[in-house]
């Protein structure tokens, strides 16, 4: 699925990052915490995208593409910096907020690889745009009796 954006209106930071994404082996890492940790949603999403899930996906990604660069998106960038071992190969995208938030999804869509959160934002970032070499998604999408939604291509990797 193609997604067109008028890139002439992008900020300098986004233009530079987009250029890097398109010219190298970049993998987006999306971590959603915020509202998922609130009392309203905690019982539905707790234990789905665990630290172990991200660690296993990162390990696999580093093995299949040793030159990979990670482009991190999160509503809790500090947690990502403190908990995920990314070394010096990471960019932490913390400048798109408010009406610019959809630009994060666009940047995700341009990466060759992706490590998704259990989030439709992640899903569309993975599904749209550039052809992906590998996408990781959590085997547990939510704490609901219906299991995984039937939306994942066979080429994506469940962890």
Predicted regions and their residues:
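Secretory-pathway luminal glycosyltransferase catalytic domains
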Residues: 1-65
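Solvent-exposed, flexible loop/coil residues
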Residues: 9, 40, 107, 155-156
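Short polar catalytic/cofactor-binding loops
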Residues: 33, 141-142
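Short aromatic-enriched loop/helix-cap "lid" or pocket-rim segments at secondary-structure transitions
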Residues: 40-43, 84, 147-149
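Residue-level detector of alpha-helical recognition elements and their boundaries
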Residues: 44, 140-141
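Donor-binding and catalytic core of enzymes assembling or modifying cell-surface/extracellular glycoconjugates
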Residues: 55, 59-137, 143-145
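Proline-rich low-complexity regions
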Residues: 138-139, 153
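Leloir-type glycosyltransferase catalytic cores
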Residues: 144-159
């Amino acid at each position: 699925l193609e997604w067109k954006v008028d890139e002439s209106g992008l900020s300098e930071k986004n233009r530079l990052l987009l250029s890097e994404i398109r010219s190298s082996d970049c993998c987006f890492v999306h971590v959603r915490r915020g509202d998922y940790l609130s009392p309203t949603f905690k019982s539905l999403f707790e234990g789905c995208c665990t630290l172990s899930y991200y660690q296993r996906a990162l390990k696999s990604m580093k093995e299949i593409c040793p030159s990979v660069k990670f482009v991190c998106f999160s509503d809790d960038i500090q947690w990502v910096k403190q908990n995920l071992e990314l070394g010096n190969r990471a960019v932490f995208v913390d400048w798109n907020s408010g009406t610019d938030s959809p630009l994060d999804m666009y940047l995700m869509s341009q990466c060759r690889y992706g490590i998704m959160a259990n989030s439709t934002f992640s899903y569309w970032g993975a599904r749209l745009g550039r052809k992906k070499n590998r996408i990781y998604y959590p085997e547990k999408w939510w704490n609901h009796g219906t299991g995984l939604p039937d939306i994942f291509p066979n080429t994506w990797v469940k962890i």
